């Protein structure tokens, strides 16, 4: 049984002093996650949220529909000139994200600290 996707936004500051929006996802990411994934991202003020981190550390499962939502988010970010990095993926999902080409749009990191430093 799929668990509901939760998403919340936190504001951090990069080592260079720039504002960073962190989207923290929790639960499973699937076709029913559109509002949590895309809705939360689209609600970010694009003029302020130039740097975005995606936190997958509390995500249990991502199916193919969920991966498609993440790709859509990344394409929208690229079209808006936003820089995105992701962290907290399991080894399996790091491999899957790499295989489907997500790394063309977002660098993948093990920890928030590594991702924040890279932005």
Where are these regions (language model features)?
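Short beta-strand/loop segment at the start of cytosolic alpha/beta domains
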Residues: 1-24
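Amphipathic alpha-helical interaction surfaces in cytosolic regulatory modules
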Residues: 28-106
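Residues at or immediately preceding the N-termini of alpha-helices
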Residues: 34, 112-113
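Acidic phosphotransfer microenvironment of two-component signaling modules
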Residues: 91, 113-114
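A short, charged, amphipathic alpha-helix used as a generic interaction element across diverse proteins
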Residues: 115-119
């Amino acid at each position: 049984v799929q668990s509901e996707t939760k998403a919340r936004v936190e504001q951090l500051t990069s080592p260079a002093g720039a504002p960073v929006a962190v989207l923290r996802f929790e639960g499973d990411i699937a076709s029913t996650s559109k509002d949590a994934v895309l809705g939360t991202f689209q609600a970010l003020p694009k003029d302020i949220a130039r740097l975005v981190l995606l936190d997958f550390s509390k995500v249990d499962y991502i199916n193919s529909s969920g991966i498609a939502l993440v790709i859509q988010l990344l394409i929208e970010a690229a079209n808006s000139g936003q820089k995105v990095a992701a962290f907290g993926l399991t080894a399996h999902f790091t491999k899957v994200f790499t295989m489907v080409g997500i790394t063309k749009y977002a660098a993948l990191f093990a920890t928030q600290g590594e991702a924040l430093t890279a932005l």
